[in-house]
Each structure stands twice: as C-alpha cells, then as structure tokens.
UniProtKB/Swiss-Prot annotation:
Keywords: Acyltransferase, Lipid A biosynthesis, Lipid biosynthesis, Lipid metabolism, Repeat, Transferase. GO terms for molecular function: N-acyltransferase activity. Pathway: Bacterial outer membrane biogenesis; LPS lipid A biosynthesis. The active site is at H257. GO terms for cellular component: membrane. Gene3D superfamilies: Hexapeptide repeat proteins (2.160.10.10), MurE/MurF, N-terminal domain (3.40.1390.10). Its EC number is 2.3.1.191. This is UDP-3-O-acylglucosamine N-acyltransferase. The lineage of its organism: Bacteria, Pseudomonadati, Pseudomonadota, Alphaproteobacteria, Hyphomicrobiales. GO terms for biological process: lipid A biosynthetic process. Catalyzes the N-acylation of UDP-3-O-acylglucosamine using 3-hydroxyacyl-ACP as the acyl donor. Is involved in the biosynthesis of lipid A, a phosphorylated glycolipid that anchors the lipopolysaccharide to the outer membrane of the cell. Homotrimer.
Length: 353
C-alpha cells in the first residue's frame, strides 16, 4: 500500500468504469461503474477502495482472502476472487496494473524535486554559460557546468554534477548525487541516484609500466532509457558508448568503454559488460551476468543470471552457465554431473562398508 507521506494519490482517484476502460477489460454484471478507488495495494493489504492484481498461482490463497475492491486477474484465476472483489479479467494483469498505478500515483512514475523546488533553488550553482530551457528544476547543491544544455521539464536532483558541454533532453530526471560528463542524453531519460556517466574508461597500454590511454569518446543515451542507482557507464575510448532507446538498466551495473547497447534491452543488477561489446535490440541479461569484451549478443537473446559470456551469441538464443552455452546443453551438463556425483557417492559408500 502506498504511503501518502511519500506518494500523492490522484486527486479524485478513478472510478471502476475508468479502471476497466484503461485496462481494456469488461465489467462483470452487477458491478457499480461509479464505484471510486483511491489507490492500489497488494492482495494482503488492500481494502475496499483499493485495486490489486494477481497472476501467480502461489498467491491463490491471498486472492481468496483479499479485501480489495477490485482485482486485475488472468482468466484462470477469475473464479477465485471473493464475493466482495470485482474481478477484472485481463490477458496481462501485471501490465494493466502498472498502467493504472501510473494514473493513481502519477508522481511515482518519474522522480521530481526533493525540495518542492520550481526553477533553480538557492544553493545550486549554474554556470552563466549553461543553457536551461524554461521549466527546468535544479535542486540545492547541484552544479551545472559551462556550455551544458538542459531541456524543459527536466529535474536535476540535489548534489548532482552536470559537466561542461553535457546535453540533457526534455522531461528527464537526474537523481541526487549523480555525475554526468562527456554525455548526450535524449528525452525522458531517468538516471537514478549515485549513477556515473561519462567518466574515463579503463584503458591502459600494458607493459613494465602501464600507460594510460586517453578516452576521447562520449556516452550517448537515447530516449526513454532508465539507468539504475550506482550504475557506471564509461565514455568511449575512440568511439562512443551508446545506450539505445527504451533500454532499462538496473542498479549496480558496469558498462565499459565503447559498449553499444541496442533498443529496449533489459540489464539486471550486478551485470558487467566489458569494452567494445555490442548488444543488439531486445537482449536480456540476468543478474550478475559477465560479458567479456569485443563480442556481439544477437537480437532478442536472453542470458541466464550469473552466467559468463565469452563468445558471440546468435540472435534469438537462450544461453546460461559458465562459460555460457545454449540452455539445453547447459541443463544436460548439470544433469550429467549430478548423476555422476550421486553414483560416485554410492560407490564410495559401498567401499566404506
């Protein structure tokens, strides 16, 4: 359940008819279309004026016991809704719920000013040569360097540092304590607190002494990208590091110099991508995946969590393991090893007898 201290509900909430229309569902016979809902909550904590959702058999008991006024459910669970809960049947309840949450709690979609600031707050430092469109918000302690450009509707959080010449598009959110240098950001980009974009890539000419290789590329972040807290994106060495449109990156991810990430990729926390690797569109990397440098992971491929990728991955593949391989081969190896270990244990027990 949302805490009103942190999340402001839409002023009038939504009627059941509005919820059904937004979710693309019909209303069951006898349901009151004018019934009003003030917010959304989990099955366990929802009350009569809350919307919930359910699409996992593990929560069947919670659905049967919920007090939610309405619940978005897939067809197979609709009959399990209790009498006091309106079942809104959807083929994708979670996606419908996400869209409705954005309407019930619009301020949760994108971070806003932490100080209810409009314009540039006292205590922020904006260089005279920086260019800010009307409607930019800058929280206390933020620093914006010479030649930086920031588009209308963007919020720069407290103690963020926007380096010289950095360009940020419109309706972006730059979190507290972030640093951006040598970077160009598109529109509607969200950068969460503590992220670092545009610092030196890790490049050295190795020898008796290690000679630093100047990193003279940039970071390019296209529209609708989200970058998690404490993620680091190094600028390119001699070409740009690129993050494609619509890609979502979790917390604590390391993206090295010259990496090119396609459109609508998903990268889960703990991932490390070494230099000059390319991810084509719609690639998914599970948590703690490691990818060595100078590889290509094909469009639509999925890599299981904690895997290590050390060779190119064809488009549309599902790989896992260390080193990563097609999941069928990986599972076959795991099963074979388990059987061998079991057999060895039995043989050892027989010898001991």
């Amino acid at each position: 359940m949302s805490d009103p201290v942190f999340f402001t509900a839409a002023a009038t909430g939504l009627t059941l008819a509005e919820i059904a229309a937004a979710a693309g569902t019909g209303l069951p016979e006898g349901a009151d279309p004018d019934r009003r809902f003030s917010g959304a909550a989990s099955l366990e904590s929802a009350g009569p004026d809350h919307l919930a959702y359910m699409d996992n058999a593990r929560y069947g008991d919670a659905l049967a016991a919920t007090r939610a006024g309405a619940c978005l459910v897939s067809p197979r669970f609709a009959a399990r809704c209790p009498a006091g809960t309106v079942a809104l049947v959807s083929r994708d309840p979670y996606r419908a719920y996400a869209a409705l949450l954005g309407r019930l709690h619009p301020d949760a979609l994108r971070p806003g000013s932490q100080f209810a600031v409009r314009g540039v707050a006292p205590g922020a430092h904006v260089h005279p040569e920086a260019r800010l469109e009307d409607g930019v918000t800058v929280d206390p302690g933020a620093v914006i360097g010479p030649g930086a450009e920031i588009g209308a509707g963007t919020v720069v959080g407290p103690n963020a540092v926007i380096g010289p010449g950095v360009r940020i598009g419109r309706d972006c959110a730059i979190g507290a304590g972030t640093t951006l240098s040598h970077a160009l950001l598109g529109n509607r980009v969200i950068v969460h607190p503590g992220a670092r974009l545009g610092q030196d890539g890790f490049g050295f000419a190795m020898g008796a002494t290690h000679l630093k290789v100047p990193q003279v590329g940039r970071v390019i972040v296209q529209d609708d990208v989200e970058i998690g807290a404490n993620t680091t994106v190094d600028r390119g060495a001699s070409r740009d590091t690129v993050i494609g449109e619509g890609t979502k990156i979790d917390n604590l991810v390391q993206i090295a110099h010259n990496v090119v990430i396609g459109r609508h990729c998903v990268i889960v926390s703990g991932v490390g991508i070494s230099g000059s690797t390319t991810l084509e569109d719609y690639v998914v990397l599970g948590g703690q995946v490691g990818v060595v440098g100078h590889l290509r992971i094909g469009r639509g491929s999925q890599i299981a969590g904690s895997s290590n990728v050390n060779r190119d991955v064809p488009p549309g593949s599902r790989w896992g393991g260390t080193p990563a391989k097609p999941v069928r081969a990986w599972f076959r190896e795991l099963t074979t090893l388990a059987r061998l270990a079991e057999r060895s244990g039995k043989d050892q027990a027989g010898d001991d007898a």
